[in-house]
Amino acid sequence: MASRGINKVILVGNLGNDPEIRYMPSGGAVANITVATSETWRDKATGEPREKTEWHRVTLYGKLAEVAGEYLRKGSQVYIEGQLQTRKWQDQNGQDRYSTEVVVQGYNGIMQMLGGRQQQGGAPAMGGAPQQQQGGWGQPQQPAAQPSYQKQAPAQQQPMQSQPQYNEPPMDFDDDIPF
């Protein structure tokens, strides 16, 4: 299938509100979230720090929507990969309106929770965030312990490795001792 372009959005930001969860007549879950991304800079004229925040509408479908509803809260930090879509709808007066949002669904959609576990109320849990090991000789190289939820085609799934990968230099025991 020929592609005529790429439509991919990547966001890392914080939720502005708790997720809104609904269910379609077919039973599939839909979650609506707003994600804030900010950039900061120093004003050249005044030297004062400046900040600009953008708010992004994100819609998640299926299992990702259920996970968002259960685990995400206002202030949660998330990594989102999806596609930009514009939809047309009519308001109460019959006027056509348009909404552009990031849609996370199917095999290309990713939602990863960042920032550790959350307690009730959205505050980070004390000691709840796993400590990531520093890489060194003889220590296993483990991926970050944050849960990642991504839909994948069953044929593309790879078997899980049961043994951790060790970052050790190769040992050559056939060498003579140099003294």
Swiss-Prot record:
Residues 6-111 form the SSB domain. Keywords: DNA damage, DNA recombination, DNA repair, DNA replication, DNA-binding. Residues 117-165 have a biased composition (Low complexity). Residues 117-179 are annotated as: Disordered. A motif (Important for interaction with partner proteins) lies at residues 174-179. GO terms for molecular function: single-stranded DNA binding. InterPro entries: NA-bd_OB-fold, Primosome_PriB/ssb, ssDNA-bd. GO terms for biological process: DNA recombination; DNA repair; DNA replication. GO terms for cellular component: nucleoid. SUPFAM superfamilies: Nucleic acid-binding proteins. Plays an important role in DNA replication, recombination and repair. Binds to ssDNA and to an array of partner proteins to recruit them to their sites of action during DNA metabolism. Homotetramer. This is Single-stranded DNA-binding protein.
